[in-house]
């Protein structure tokens, strides 16, 4: 394979990866944890947070705070895994 063919293939792979990155960015990731529901976009922006009224205890606000934090962190981890898989897919492709 000559250098021009390698450059063309690299550009094609880069374009494909950019398309897939945009698809992940638009995707919604949903995590449900014990009465908490977090919907996060692939851009890592929170779309919605739903909290079950049964969880709201004025005597223990830390419970809800902890559950929200856990759900958000899990959503971020799931998104990061998708991006890592995408990166692995293209880094293992020979040019």
From Swiss-Prot:
Source organism superkingdom: Bacteria
Function: Binds to DNA and alters its conformation. May be involved in regulation of gene expression, nucleoid organization and DNA protection.
Quaternary structure, from the entry: Homodimer.
An annotated GO cellular component: cytoplasm
SUPFAM superfamilies: YbaB-like (SSF82607)
Localization annotation: Cytoplasm, Nucleoid
Origin species: Metamycoplasma arthritidis (strain 158L3-1)
Keyword terms, alphabetized: Cytoplasm, DNA-binding
GO molecular function terms noted in the UniProt entry: DNA binding
Similarity comment text for this entry: Belongs to the YbaB/EbfC family.
Protein name from the UniProt record: Nucleoid-associated protein MARTH_orf159
